[in-house]
A protein has these predicted regions:
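Subset of outer-membrane beta-barrel
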Residues: 21-277
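Bacterial N-terminal signal peptides
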Residues: 7-16
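Positively charged n-region of N-terminal signal peptides that target proteins for export
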Residues: 1-4
Length: 277
């Protein structure tokens, strides 16, 4: 029981999620890894719309992905994420489901996203979420929120975008003092070559310091890629290797926090037939 209390009370503030007056849904420790392709034209996948729903507009094949991580090697801090993208002639749709925690403390978010191009230079996207948190002995609390984003195609190699999560705020459940925090970000991506992609994102979460995510992807072969990056707010680093075979891709990831240690993760993506261009 003492282990449970220590995990809930001490690990959540260090992860940047539980605060006295505001709370945000847990993202993977390697969230920057999953969303690295958001501001790319050539390296978009089913997870790319996580940091900006406008990235859905560039997904040209129905896809499904699952990601799991054992945060800081503690099973009580495990996170699971299932994502689906469905392109249509009227725009592209996405589904996102996340579960974090264990029996005595857990968070769940279910999201429905939509993204499309507006002309040749701008993509837009929006997502509606149902978020809930449960603490054993204290009950449940839930709320509904939304996030919105846009991506500008400045050149053939350079993209930039803006994103807002829960911009209007709102309380969590019936507790007036507890609310879901807002988060704003601006990102940029540069296609240095067919093999090299660079990305950077600035985030500002309510009541938290500014965070910068910077990442690099290098594609050795069509079937083999590597990603690496850093998040400045926690001085965390991440690294991953992805292997592709036909319509399947598997990535093994790891992130490192200077105080809390290593978080291993595993990602699987399956892409169905591409839609007609």
């Amino acid at each position: 029981m003492r282990r449970v209390i220590v995990i809930v009370v001490f690990s959540l503030p260090l992860c940047g999620s539980w605060k006295a007056l505001s709370q945000t849904v847990h993202s993977p420790v390697s969230a920057a890894y999953l969303g690295l392709g958001a501001y790319s034209n050539n390296h978009v996948d089913v997870f790319s719309f996580h940091p900006n729903q406008a990235a859905l507009a560039k997904i040209n094949a129905a896809s499904a992905g699952i990601y799991g991580e054992k945060r800081f090697l503690l099973k009580e801090l495990s996170l699971y994420n299932v994502t689906v993208a469905l392109p249509t002639h009227s725009g592209n749709f996405g589904l996102d489901a996340r579960y974090y925690g264990f029996a005595d403390y857990n968070e769940t978010q279910l999201g429905l996203a939509y993204g499309r191009s507006v002309g040749n230079k701008i993509d837009v996207g929006v997502q509606f979420n149902y978020y809930s948190v449960r603490i054993a002995g204290y009950g449940n609390a839930s709320t509904v929120n939304f996030e919105i984003g846009t991506i500008f195609h400045l050149t053939d190699k350079l993209n930039a975008g803006l994103h807002a999560y829960n911009p209007v705020g709102g309380k969590l459940g019936k507790v007036e003092e507890e609310k879901l925090a807002s988060l704003y970000s601006a990102g940029i991506g540069y296609e240095a070559s067919e093999k090299v992609f660079l990305s950077a994102e600035i985030e500002k979460q309510e009541d938290e310091p500014i965070n910068v995510n910077a990442g690099l992807q290098y594609k050795f072969l069509r079937q083999l890629l590597a990603r690496a990056g850093v998040s400045t707010a926690t001085s965390s680093m991440y690294l991953g290797i992805g292997f592709g075979w036909k319509s399947l891709r598997m990535d093994a990831t790891a992130s490192y926090h200077p105080q809390l240690g290593v978080t291993p993760g595993l990602l699987l993506i399956f892409a169905f037939n591409k839609k007609e261009q």
